[in-house]
């Protein structure tokens, strides 16, 4: 557990470190959100993600992301992301975004699984370097949790495989 906390802390800190170069190529996003679970058992998750993007062109960027996702268990997703601005950047810029990766479980009684998210959103420019971002989309999260049943005569344990299909809403800041 200490290793996981250290790794996540290292990733968060590395996103905040500024380089010595005067030209800034990377874009950073801090976002939070929730979703409506479309399956049973239903669980309303809470997500906090940080992403970093490298611009391939004026409208297309790729990058990586991580964060915390709170389902039945706490998950630490690590994913690759791609973002396409539908129009040229301006005050309101619509975009489409896609990410795929794996979420690691922070609990020893659970295993993470495949993570996928796609969304459609809009960015609102507050200044040259700071933008607000609002998006809605679909998120898929697979995970496995270990369940235990006990009574006076026996103890049984089994792995429960869960797949969450979410309609998600996220709000974030781009800097």
Predicted regions, residues:
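Bacterial Sec-dependent N-terminal signal peptides
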Residues: 1-24, 171, 175
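Flexible loop residues that form catalytic
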Residues: 9, 65, 139
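Transmembrane beta-strand segments of Gram-negative outer membrane beta-barrel proteins
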Residues: 20-36
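Short, solvent-exposed coil/turn segments
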Residues: 23-25, 45, 75, 91, ...
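Polar/charged side chains located within well-ordered beta-strands of beta-rich proteins
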Residues: 28-30, 50-52, 138, 165
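Gram-negative (and chloroplast) outer-membrane scaffold detector with strong preference
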Residues: 34, 42, 49-132, 172-175
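Predominantly the C-terminal beta-signal and adjacent terminal strand-loop region
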Residues: 121-175
């Amino acid at each position: 557990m200490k290793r996981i906390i250290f790794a996540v802390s290292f990733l968060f800190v590395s996103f905040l470190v500024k380089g010595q170069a005067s030209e800034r190529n990377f874009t950073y996003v801090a976002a939070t959100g929730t979703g409506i679970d479309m399956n049973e058992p239903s669980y309303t998750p809470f997500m906090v993600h940080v992403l970093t993007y490298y611009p391939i062109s004026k409208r297309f960027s790729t990058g990586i992301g991580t964060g915390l996702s709170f389902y039945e268990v706490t998950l630490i997703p690590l994913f690759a992301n791609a973002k396409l601005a539908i129009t040229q950047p301006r005050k309101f810029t619509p975009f489409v975004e896609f990410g795929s990766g794996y979420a690691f479980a922070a609990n020893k009684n659970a295993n993470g699984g495949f993570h996928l998210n796609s969304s459609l959103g809009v960015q609102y420019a507050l200044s040259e370097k700071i933008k607000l971002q609002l998006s809605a989309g679909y998120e898929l999260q697979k995970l496995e949790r270990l369940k235990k049943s006990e009574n006076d005569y026996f103890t049984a344990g089994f792995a429960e495989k869960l797949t969450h299909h979410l309609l998600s809403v996220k709000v974030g800041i781009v800097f």
